[in-house]
Amino acid sequence: MTPSGRPRPLEASRAVKAESPAPFVLASASPRRLALLRQAGLEPSVVIAPEIDEALRKGELPRAYALRVAIAKIEAVIAKERGSFVLAADTVVAVGRRILPKADSEVDVELCLRLLSGRRHVVLTALALKPPAKPMRTRVVATRVAFKVLSKREIDGYVASGEGIGKAGGYAVQGRAEAFVRWINGSYSNVVGLPLYETLALLEGSGWVSARHRV
């Protein structure tokens, strides 16, 4: 309501709700993470693609690897964004202790699908959030997925579609590969690339979301 008792104009109300105590920076090059945040009503002030070394270290396990990379993404941009809430994430697909590659080629996609065919695997996303003037907060979210047994025709068709290129584990669950999934135990959005519930909880726990929606 305005001081005169009249309802606040819709545009003004939206403008107030869009305010935040500090800028929100997404340290990720993933269009899927940006789309998921927008789906949840969150629009980053800035999107930065961090330049880091994501090479797997000898003996590194999936959870430790994902967390290390997510933290490295924060560290790569935080010097220029100290007054911001900086969010980073890294998603890996693993069969047991083996981390499947982010598919850079059709050969990678085929390799991943053959490894996933008829088996269970885990999708891990490490979240890292650096609020202004506060310690970094982290969380790792796991979703278990089971694939049906894939025929050669299904594998060849998916490889030829090009959909798996650039995806962790060589597939996109939100696309044609959804037909390969027998069941999912855990966050579906985590398999896409960002666990929304846990991300919002991390932001809210840091004070960003609650302040953002204060009217």
Over which residues does each language-model region extend?
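Intrinsic, low-complexity polybasic segments
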Residues: 4-8
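Anionic-ligand binding patches
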Residues: 13-25, 60-215
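N-terminal beta1-alpha1 ligand-phosphate binding loop
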Residues: 17-42
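Cofactor-binding loop segments of dinucleotide-utilizing enzymes, especially the Rossmann-like FAD-
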Residues: 29, 50, 132
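Short loop/helix-cap segments at secondary-structure boundaries that form the rim of catalytic
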Residues: 36-39, 57, 79-80
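A short linear boundary/processing microfeature
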Residues: 42-43, 53, 119, 161
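Short glycine-rich, Thr/Ser-proximal phosphate-binding strand/loop in the N-terminal lobe
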Residues: 44-59, 136-142
